Amino acid sequence: MEISGLVYLIIIVTIIDLPYGKANNYCKIKCLKGGVHTACKYGSLKPNCGNKVVVSYGLTKQEKQDILKEHNDFRQKVARGLETRGNPGPQPPAKNMKNLVWNDELAYVAQVWANQCQYGHDTCRDVAKYQVGQNVALTGSTAAKYENPVNLVKMWENEVKDYNPKKKFSENNFIKIGHYTQMVWANTKEIGCGSMKYTENKWHYHYLVCNYGPSGNFGNEELYQTK
């Protein structure tokens, strides 16, 4: 990366350097969609953002707790039949939707991907015990401020307004509702997320990646069992 003039760049690292990259041989994992595993291809938590300027990466302990709480609060809202939005709403209550728990391995793989500063889904992120789903969100501003990660999670929640519970999951418009459906997928038990803040062309970006296991969004299944 070449930067003209004299620039003092301080990169703040808020994530613990987890041992999973060394403890697990991700290069042996074969994902259903094919491709090289993210943690094998990139190999570490070192940012690889090209001409983008890294401001900070990783999540604090409090941010992890807040993201997990936001997911579980929303899941319980839907499960209790309190989500009135939809196309049409309300969303039916669920009888098999449990709270998620944080998984550090999912978080590690999510952080490796976030550290590439490439908005979008990676190809292969599965872990040994299950297939892994993924939600991504990116916000940008010309002001030197970065969105709270919980607000990025709420962007996924807002997709519920386009979900039609009277249709099968596969009959809904996945592009409009896929983040919401992964959030409330009943068979998903664990979550782990990574975060990257960077600047490019005077814009300030916050990129959030959350990985979910077991993965949701299978076309022949339903989000959850209704009461």
UniProtKB/Swiss-Prot annotation:
Gene Ontology CC: extracellular region
PROSITE patterns the record matches: CRISP_1, CRISP_2
Signal peptide: 1-23
Keywords annotated in UniProt: Allergen, Disulfide bond, Secreted, Signal
Keyword Metal-binding appears in the UniProt entry: no
SUPFAM superfamilies, sorted: PR-1-like (SSF55797)
Stretches assigned to the SCP domain: 68-212
Protein name in the entry: Venom allergen 5
